[in-house]
Amino acid sequence: MSVAPGVILRGRTVVGGCAEGEALVTRETISGWGGIDPTTGTIIETRHPLHGVSFKNKILVFPGAKGSSAWSAAFHVARLAGAAPKAMIFTVMTTKVALGAVVLRAPAVTDLDQDPLTVIETGDWVRVDADLGIVEVFKRVKI
């Protein structure tokens, strides 16, 4: 796999910091408690398109959170277990996802000038500079 020159997205910082890695993208919201296995970072929600896929060490790109207020607790446990995503990029800001981002202590951005769910694809290399609110996307080139 090789990558093409980067696309820049600009947004709003939720949690500062910098991270880069492979993107894991879903257009479906993620349920925290009961929707993920926080010890492995695997999505266990039966009908979710990423069922059985782990977000561990990925840049998680998703619309936002669904479910109970225990969402943040699930992501806190994932961080403690070493199974958390490296960074989060999301489109819908709620108190659940904001608190989840804070307890995760990983860079997080929202309110981007382009829709990250259409610009970023699973497997793209993504660099998140949440301090500046910048996301750089290096498109995966299929050879």
Please identify what each model-predicted range represents:
Residues 2-19, 24-136, 142:
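Feature captures the catalytic cores and cofactor-binding loops of soluble hydro-lyases/lyases
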